[in-house]
Regions:
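Short beta-strand-to-turn element immediately C-terminal to the catalytic PLP-Schiff-base lysine
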Residues: 4, 152-157, 177-178, 197, ...
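Structural motif corresponding to alpha-helix initiation and N-cap regions
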Residues: 71-72, 125, 183-184, 257, ...
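Gly/Ser/Thr-rich phosphate-binding loop
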Residues: 56-59, 83-88, 98-164, 168-175, ...
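Short hydrophobic "strand-cap" motifs at the C-terminus of beta-strands
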Residues: 39-40, 89, 118-119, 143, ...
Length: 329
């Protein structure tokens, strides 16, 4: 290889490179090679896209041997393989991961882990803080997007600098628009639909109606609008509210289940929670919380409603409670 370097080109002195050095560059030095464990199913976009990206970069992709997610098995494999990256999908994975670490302090050598990444489901600030307490050298990447709208937003967390739940930096091709196609101004407090432009799918196969609803022309540009509602903070960051198709209408007020679920999960007696709307003769719908409690405790509707009310508007507090053994996520 002959290449005139900037500092030596005028002198006619090319830098020398050996064949072994070129081969090492192609293969990638050992310390830069990524070993990724994809804990998420490969049929899910998060697992599939992450695996393809890693393989295209020359990395190694590993799947867990069991058909059902087992956090202890994950940490065993991380230690055995000296994994550098872990791919998961929100709290359904990160909650048992943290519980396993808390129950087995110091059991695993996790010094190889450089990053943990998630997309497709909520990942709370509190859980991120807990995981980083056990793996302080790692970075956490929390991405917001969908199969038809990749790259809507992202947040990064490190030990002592955990990003807020459902708060994201907007991607370069992302905007937030009202239903009539007007762009939402930062800091206005106005709600809008998150949209992304750029490389987009042609549409949904044999579903012209859904394609027309999702892929829209706004400001002379084609956008993918999957249906997620958000506000734009004054600093330009995005506050995700939730998917409009599951929005609960109670007495004319819109309530996004995700924000109520997030509040419920902050209660000490709640391990997991799902919020749904149930028919109500007066308000049209009322908020029902389905809760999986921590072991040995039984939360009441009164205490959970008061807890949610302390963080959100009163009409967003659950009016009905169902306690189950497991949410099953």
């Amino acid at each position: 290889q002959v290449l005139g370097a900037g500092g030596n080109a005028a002198l006619g002195i090319p830098p020398a490179t050996s064949i072994p050095e070129l081969i090492e560059r192609i293969q990638g030095p050992e310390h830069l090679r990524a070993t990724m464990i994809v804990a998420a199913p490969l049929m899910h976009g998060t697992g599939q896209f992450s695996a393809i990206i890693s393989l295209n970069g020359g990395g190694t992709v590993c799947a867990l041997p069991s058909r059902k997610f087992d956090a202890v098995e994950l940490w065993n494999e991380v230690e055995r393989l000296k994994a550098t990256n872990i791919v998961l999908v929100g709290l359904a994975f990160s909650t048992p991961m943290l519980e396993a670490l808390e129950a087995n302090p110091g059991r695993w050598d996790l010094s190889s882990v450089r990053s943990m990444s998630s997309s497709g489901s909520m990942w709370s600030q509190e859980n991120k803080r807990g995981l980083l307490g056990h793996i302080p050298q790692a970075m956490i990447a929390d991405s917001f997007g969908s199969s038809e709208a990749v790259g809507l937003g992202a947040s990064a967390s490190a030990a002592g600098m955990e990003a807020q739940t459902a708060a994201f930096m907007l991607g370069p091709n992302t905007g937030v628009f009202t239903e009539d196609g007007r762009r939402v101004e930062p800091g206005s407090g106005e709600r809008g639909l998150v949209a992304v432009s750029g490389f987009l799918p042609m549409g949904y196969y044999k579903d012209e109606e859904k394609s027309a609803k999702t892929f829209r022309i706004m400001e002379g540009v084609r956008w993918s609008v999957p249906g997620d509602w958000a506000e734009v903070n004054a600093d330009g960051t995005l506050k995700l509210l939730g998917r409009g198709s599951v929005c609960i209408n109670t007495g004319g007020e819109k309530v996004f289940p995700e924000e109520v679920e997030e509040a419920l999960k902050r209660h000490a007696s709640v391990r997991d929670a799902v919020v749904v709307g149930v028919p109500d003769p007066r308000f049209g719908e009322r908020i029902c919380a389905v809760v999986e409690p921590e072991a040995g405790v039984l939360p009441t509707l009164a205490e959970l409603s008061a807890h949610v009310h302390s963080q959100l508007a009163g009409y967003k507090a659950p009016r009905e409670l169902v306690v189950v053994d497991t949410i099953g996520q």
